[in-house]
Amino acid sequence: MCGIVGVVGNTNATDILIQGLEKLEYRGYDSAGIFVLDGADNHLVKAVGRIAELSAKTAGVEGTTGIGHTRWATHGKPTEDNAHPHRSETERFVLVHNGVIENYLEIKEEYLAGHHFKGQTDTEIAVHLIGKFAEEDGLSVLEAFKKALHIIRGSYAFALIDSENPDVIYVAKNKSPLLIGLGEGYNMVCSDAMAMIRETNQYMEIHDQELVIVKADSVEVQDYDGNSRERASYTAELDLSDIGKGTYPYYMLKEIDEQPTVMRKLIQAYTDDAGQVVIDPAIIKAVQDADRIYILAAGTSYHAGFASKKMLEELTDTPVELGISSEWGYGMPLLSKKPLFIFISQSGETADSRQVLVKANEMGIPSLTVTNVPGSTLSREANYTMLLHAGPEIAVASTKAYTAQIAALAFLAKAVGEANGNAKAQAFDLVHELSIVAQSIESTLSEKETIEAKVRELLETTRNAFYIGRGQDYYVAMEASLKLKEISYIQCEGFAAGELKHGTIALIEEGTPVLALLSDPVLANHTRGNIQEVAARGAKVLTIAEENVAKDTDDIVLTTVHPYLSPISMVVPTQLVAYFATLHRGLDVDKPRNLAKSVTVE
């Protein structure tokens, strides 16, 4: 949520800021702004809406130093007054901020009596506080910033400019992502390496409660007490071509189409030349040592955990429990004696999951992060990491990351099972079976026109819909319903088909769309009984079935794949259902309202 970009020492500062903010659009925002300095001249430009609207207002704005921000409203409505950057009382200091300041009202009452505020944000309180300490109390800029940081409670990533000294950006963070980008003769600040991919692939991490003084030719890292911290840079393996849409109208469609390639990349990443599964032995041992696996995640990643639960349990001989990170952060249940926490997060920055990880580290619980972003916070702070190798996922609605998460966990389960001598794991030819999955997805993708026609007939005008399934198909139904509701705004719920008669069937009326998923030969006929129940009450039914359970009347038929991997192939047509339903409603597929790609506040 939200994004920060900053640059010092580059004559193309405005262009760098705008292009950086464009690359952060996927994170979600409702307004944006930049502040640019060129010597004594400075320019503050804000806009509500898209970056294109901000860019149109920056003609003639030039400078060598600046900060930019995309805002997702948490305090105050999306207006230009509330958009960042914000200025201090005298307008000398300018600040952008991601996160939530928990004690901003206390700060306002205790320190800022008589100050005049233009908006209703917690960020404006912070920059006024810094300004007060520097201009009213006579502290140096650095000491004023430090004093403010000691007072402020909450999550934050700050980038501060002193208009009287345009050669430096002051940066600090706590529980919110922020990086330093290292350029040739200039340096940068960004929430995400993707924002600066055009400028550099060299980055420096900032840890919690660290302050960084960024100049064109130097970067100095300190703790809040002024003690220097040594920090090496690292290279981010990102490709500029990966983050473009190419010939696609939307990122989501591109990312759906990339899924067969992602499956094959995972095979390459987690097998050796002989085709044997290769996982870090330390990760295998961590799973072997655990008496219970706890998967912590949110949203789509949570659903991927459910879809992987049976496979993990059967192949590793270890019980698996699922937890919603936002719930566990405030109330961790009674744990087993030797737990292992697995965090699933596309971005590796999910604030709710990090809150749990911090507690796990304090308790000495071993942890594994499964993420798409190397060097992300969850990756750095967990004991172990498995990467998804899916490439940047830009669309807010996750597609390829979900399928990659299940596939990555399959490699983990296979490796641990083989190490344990588990017969099912030894018989599970994952490389072969995942190759079949890739082919199945390609076959589904070739039927886009057929799927689009069925979606137009079923969903174009409806306000409600249901997905149903049993077993693994129920977990896919959960993800399918989330995908449909989050981008098409159709109120959709995913249910275990057997639960219909326990209440949900009361919502079925003439014309209600019900989408049924069938892949398990043992359960398919039971689900077909539920289909008959809803059809008898007037529901319009669309069935998605694997060949081994398909009937001539089914609408979408998929290649049969291994049961452990069926959630990967079964979810793809539901992704297309969501895409086409949204497209034919004239909505923005990639940027649904009120949602952010990376949820970095609790």
From Swiss-Prot:
Keywords from the UniProt entry: Aminotransferase, Cytoplasm, Glutamine amidotransferase, Repeat, Transferase
GO cellular component: cytosol
InterPro entries: GATase_2_dom, GFAT, GFAT_N, GlmS/AgaS_SIS, GlmS/FrlB_SIS, Ntn_hydrolases_N, SIS_dom, SIS_dom_sf
Positions of region (Disordered): 67-87
Annotated active site: 2, 597
Entry annotated with the keyword Transferase: yes
GO MF entries: carbohydrate derivative binding; glutamine-fructose-6-phosphate transaminase (isomerizing) activity
SUPFAM superfamilies reported for this sequence: N-terminal nucleophile aminohydrolases (Ntn hydrolases) (SSF56235), SIS domain (SSF53697)
GO terms under biological process: carbohydrate metabolic process; fructose 6-phosphate metabolic process; protein N-linked glycosylation; UDP-N-acetylglucosamine metabolic process
CDD domains: GFAT, SIS_GlmS_GlmD_1, SIS_GlmS_GlmD_2
Residue stretches of biased makeup (Basic and acidic residues): 77-87
Gene3D superfamilies found in the cross-reference section: Glucose-6-phosphate isomerase like protein, domain 1, Glutamine Phosphoribosylpyrophosphate, subunit 1, domain 1
Catalysis: reaction(s): D-fructose 6-phosphate + L-glutamine = D-glucosamine 6-phosphate + L-glutamate
SIS domain sequence ranges: 283-422, 455-592
Protein localization: Cytoplasm
EC id: 2.6.1.16
Job of this protein: Catalyzes the first step in hexosamine metabolism, converting fructose-6P into glucosamine-6P using glutamine as a nitrogen source.
Description of how the protein assembles with itself and partners: Homodimer.
Protein name in UniProt: Glutamine--fructose-6-phosphate aminotransferase [isomerizing]
Originating species: Streptococcus pneumoniae (strain ATCC BAA-255 / R6)
Lineage per the UniProt record: Bacteria, Bacillati, Bacillota, Bacilli, Lactobacillales
